[in-house]
């Protein structure tokens, strides 16, 4: 079960498209493209593009008063997201690296406005809105008859770093107002996900409950 530990009024906001919500799932279905394995990690281009477009929309709608963080469990995905943000004008090349564009680096109060990084880069930090790039998107099936170490191996193969409970906890607790998971929704559906990635499955359930209550 997911608990924020903070009062509901802390999450009140008027972010366009998410009014009244503290949790949302932006579905990027499997047919938009599977995960791609790159030693030592994974990336998914369709997710990176979706995130960049949504970050651009929200950043420009809400202006420099709103801070946004984009988290992935994979460094390769962070690099893809930065490239996609560059395509949207939110990042630029500087000293041979892609970095957040100067005009998007600070909020009007002087805080960091936009950050992209792995979970480690978000330790101890909070942003008004956080996008979590799920990355893992596959059609791997874990047969019911598989048990013990073999079952764990198959679940690890399907979900990867999403199974690291401590990192998932950090990733899901960096937002002040809104957390948006971006990825293939089916990866958080069904008994397999409840066993393999319980926090992600619970988050999708929360998103659906908010939708059902008209929030």
Regions found by a protein language model. Give the residues of each.
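Helicase C-terminal subdomain and adjacent C-terminal extension
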Residues: 142-215
